[in-house]
């Protein structure tokens, strides 16, 4: 309850700042997110949020894991990653709380962001764990797309003016580690 109140207060500050700057399409500031996609692990049934140390224990290939983290400048164990442990619930709302706060603050036009299906699938796939529920990363990806399509439909119904699909490290993933079975970023 205290966290929720603080989240709402700080989000309202972000909204006020944007309005004061003359920004016409407002964003929440994503203050409820550890990073651009880890919040999925807190919301979606079938997904758990794991620390990099927990991931390292599950993979068994510590050297490749360490290298992949160094390549992505994430070796300080400050990042959490959503990992799929069972079939995911594709009907859950991802950005419901963000939208409620935006609506409650009388914002006329607002934007919402979602992680890209490719990076979300790639992050959630851990062969040693996810392979027990999905036959392939592609099969998991199909459910991730269903999840995102469901959220997009709901966002449109709620009047979201812009929906941004984030893939901030996509080029690095594609060009540096495209053949990896597991990735942690």
Protein language model features and the residues they cover:
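Domain-level signal for soluble alpha/beta catalytic cores
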Residues: 1-185
């Amino acid at each position: 309850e205290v966290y929720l109140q603080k989240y709402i207060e700080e989000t309202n500050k972000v909204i006020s700042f944007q309005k004061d700057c003359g920004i016409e399409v407002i964003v929440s500031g994503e203050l409820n997110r550890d990073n651009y996609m880890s919040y999925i692990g807190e919301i979606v049934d079938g997904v758990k949020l794991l620390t990099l140390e927990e991931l390292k224990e599950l993979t068994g290939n510590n050297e490749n894991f360490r290298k992949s983290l160094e390549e992505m400048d994430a070796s300080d164990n400050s990042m959490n990653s959503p990992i799929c442990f069972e079939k995911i619930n594709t009907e859950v709302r991802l950005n419901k709380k963000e939208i409620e706060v935006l609506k409650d603050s009388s914002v006329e036009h607002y934007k919402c962001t979602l992680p890209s299906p490719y990076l979300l699938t790639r992050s959630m796939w851990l062969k040693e764990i996810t392979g027990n529920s999905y036959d392939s990363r592609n099969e998991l990806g199909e459910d991730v797309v269903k999840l995102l399509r469901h959220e997009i439909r709901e966002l449109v119904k709620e009047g979201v003016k812009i929906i941004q699909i984030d893939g901030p490290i996509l080029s690095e993933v594609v060009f540096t580690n495209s053949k990896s079975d597991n990735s942690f970023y």
